[in-house]
């Protein structure tokens, strides 16, 4: 399907589908389409958000979603993290935006046995020697559908959990490589553990509706919580979430990085944080779109 919307192409489409620009990210320009009218409208939106004025039309996947994060050092390949991605479905036809990542993924054993060898073979064939890479997968009936690879640090910032638990910082490694040609870690094989030594981790995303932020409650208090290793806050009181930020990662108020010893402790901590968080707009309305349902864990 292209911008000409030829009838012979349109009649082949099986709904629902996801339409997205070929050269954008963070959910920008993406739409869920359930019929032909939505498909044409969504495609035009994708084109408007594409530098190349091109878009993709894909089957909309309603299944598990994971991300695998790799480290490369002198041609050696390390799976450094793997997480389940949980997205909100409460924003109409907008692209599902992540509201939490849970480490390690419930699919970690199958992925490592079945998919990791295939990925490693591909990486070697591509000649990747140094760097970091994340790639996401839809998991449906034990089949893995790869999408959205990124040969770079990620907005999710998995390196925060990795540095806290395994003791190596991808940011420093990449700076070392840029300046010296070496990633600068001599014992990476010993330090790297994609299962995080049995710890249970979560990156909790706080998404906001559009509007002027009057009050933020519960974020500042997290600085005193020993289970919260970092809070990445992107909006402050008095700032505005614009309409065009909703439905992509620009609507993220904060990402909260949590480390617990057990799944029970993690669930308890997430529920505690949820009960304390609130963001109020100038009309005294709650702005938080959705928070992780811990019954899914």
Regions found by a protein language model. Name each.
Residues 59-66, 70-128, 132, 139, ...:
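ATP-dependent carboxylate/phosphate-activation module, predominantly the ATP-grasp catalytic core
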Residues 58, 129-141, 187, 288-293:
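A short glycine-rich, hydrophobically flanked beta-strand micro-motif that places a catalytic Asp/Glu
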Residues 16-19, 30-63, 93-102, 120-125, ...:
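Conserved ATP-binding module of the ATP-grasp superfamily
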Residues 7-9, 176-297:
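Peripheral (often C-terminal) accessory segments that flank ATP-dependent C-N-forming ligase machineries
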Residues 17, 78, 145-148:
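Protein kinase-like catalytic core scaffold
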Residues 31, 59, 103, 163, ...:
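Short, well-ordered beta-strand elements within core beta-sheets of diverse protein domains
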Residues 1-29:
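A conserved helix-loop-beta module that forms one wall/lid of the active-site cleft
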């Amino acid at each position: 399907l292209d911008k000409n919307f030829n009838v012979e192409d349109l009649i082949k489409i099986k709904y629902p589908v996801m339409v997205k620009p070929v050269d954008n990210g963070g959910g920008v320009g993406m739409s869920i389409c359930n019929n032909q009218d939505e498909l044409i409208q969504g495609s035009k939106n994708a084109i408007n958000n594409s530098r190349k004025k091109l878009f993709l039309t894909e089957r909309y996947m309603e299944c598990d979603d994971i991300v695998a994060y790799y480290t490369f050092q002198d041609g050696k390949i390390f799976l450094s993290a793997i997480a389940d991605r949980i997205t909100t479905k409460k924003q109409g036809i907008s692209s599902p935006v992540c509201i939490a990542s849970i480490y390690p993924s419930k699919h970690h054993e199958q992925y490592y046995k079945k998919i990791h060898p295939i990925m490693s073979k591909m990486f070697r064939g591509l000649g990747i020697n140094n760097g970091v890479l994340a790639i996401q997968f839809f998991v449906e009936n034990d089949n893995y559908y790869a999408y959205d690879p990124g040969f770079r640090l990620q907005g999710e910032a998995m390196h925060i959990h990795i540095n806290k638990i395994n003791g190596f910082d991808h940011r420093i490694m990449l700076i070392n490589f840029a300046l010296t040609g070496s990633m600068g870690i001599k014992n990476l094989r010993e330090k790297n553990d994609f299962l995080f030594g049995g710890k249970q981790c979560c990156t909790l995303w706080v998404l906001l509706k559009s509007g002027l932020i009057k009050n933020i409650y519960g974020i500042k208090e997290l600085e005193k919580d020993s289970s919260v290793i970092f809070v990445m806050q992107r909006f402050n009181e008095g700032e505005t979430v614009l309409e065009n930020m909703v439905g992509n990662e620009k609507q993220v108020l904060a990402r909260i990085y949590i480390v617990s010893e057990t799944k029970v402790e993690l669930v308890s901590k997430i529920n505690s944080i949820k009960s304390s968080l609130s963001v109020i707009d100038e009309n005294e309305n709650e702005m938080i779109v959705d928070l992780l349902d811990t019954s899914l864990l």
